[in-house]
Amino acid sequence: MSTILEKISAIESEMARTQKNKATSAHLGLLKAKLAKLRRELISPKGGGGGTGEAGFEVAKTGDARVGFVGFPSVGKSTLLSNLAGVYSEVAAYEFTTLTTVPGCIKYKGAKIQLLDLPGIIEGAKDGKGRGRQVIAVARTCNLIFMVLDCLKPLGHKKLLEHELEGFGIRLNKKPPNIYYKRKDKGGINLNSMVPQSELDTDLVKTILSEYKIHNADITLRYDATSDDLIDVIEGNRIYIPCIYLLNKIDQISIEELDVIYKIPHCVPISAHHHWNFDDLLELMWEYLRLQRIYTKPKGQLPDYNSPVVLHNERTSIEDFCNKLHRSIAKEFKYALVWGSSVKHQPQKVGIEHVLNDEDVVQIVKKV
């Protein structure tokens, strides 16, 4: 472990010393690729044993979505969780109070949302310091990250936390790079650019790929990509998670400072202690989770509006709905009757591939 950390430290120092220009781009690209490989080793060391096995760290996934609270120690994560979900997570006015993952659950708009108060991340978590590695491993399983920041401390904390999460392959509020990449057995490196590139050229791409011992591949760049984007695609283990920045303790700042905070993208100012602005926070959480509620309607009965079937936005077909209820239903499926905004007629007969909208009502008709 220490040798990996030493190598990472040496590469980061060299990158900091190297001036960024066209002449050094290939060298920097190579260093970035080496750094990504070392970080992968750090995340998943060889010769498993299934993790550290420390008590309280991984929590069984329950509910329709999982939200992780990430932040430096003593920024108010535990207070926020207790006030949102009524869960007691040990709170004190000194750092490192929460030492295990504390789960809570809230019901919002019919969906059950699991909330995880993760132990405070300290600087250097991605390098194995503190319990940061286990914390970030749990953060990777979340559908949404709440990054809790103390608005009395500068936004430098935000940059540090983003840097820690980036080091573990978590990309916040980003989409996967629009790059086509396929390895092949022969034919060398074939690079196609659909738009002019400001950083990547054939030589730099070959340099990065050679670090991964890849000498035959087809690559299509569909936008002006960076070497970091290409490395993310090659690594293939990146997680893209939406993030909301919660600037806590707004009861201790002026109105003018609050106006500045409101201009920060993906940001909600709150006071966990005084329950201020929780409505805005929950509404934004719902928007970022992109969940869809589908109501069931048994034959001859009224729809059940109390317990919706909750689907994730990218998986909202009738087949996904059937599988969420029970896997056997899709096999016995004949057709479905749908009421709602996804159909022209009320009701409309649809097949298993029909895509549903939020708050549609569905009645399944099985084969006889």
Swiss-Prot record:
TGS domain boundaries: 290-366
UniProt xrefs under SUPFAM superfamilies: P-loop containing nucleoside triphosphate hydrolases, TGS-like
InterPro entries hit by this protein: Beta-grasp_dom_sf (IPR012675), DRG (IPR045001), G_OBG (IPR031167), GTP-bd (IPR006073), GTP-binding_2 (IPR031662), GTP1-OBG_CS (IPR006074), P-loop_NTPase (IPR027417), Small_GTP-bd (IPR005225)
PANTHER family attached to this UniProt entry: DEVELOPMENTALLY-REGULATED GTP-BINDING PROTEIN 2
Domain OBG-type G: 65-290
Tagged with keyword ATP-binding: no
Gene3D superfamilies the UniProt entry points to: 3.10.20.30, 6.10.140.1070
NCBIfam families the record matches: small_GTP
Gene Ontology cellular-component terms listed: cytoplasm
Main function: Catalyzes the conversion of GTP to GDP through hydrolysis of the gamma-phosphate bond in GTP. Dfd/deformed is required to activate 128up in maxillary segment cells.
GO biological process, any: cytoplasmic translation
GO terms of molecular function: GTP binding; GTPase activity
Name used for this protein in its record: Guanylate binding protein 128up
Lineage: Eukaryota, Metazoa, Ecdysozoa, Arthropoda, Hexapoda
Tissues where the protein occurs: Expressed in posterior-lateral epidermis of the maxillary lobe.
Keyword Membrane: no
Family: Belongs to the TRAFAC class OBG-HflX-like GTPase superfamily. OBG GTPase family.
CDD domains for the chain: DRG, TGS_DRG1
Residues modified to (3S)-3-hydroxylysine: K22
Keyword terms of this UniProt record: GTP-binding, Hydroxylation, Nucleotide-binding
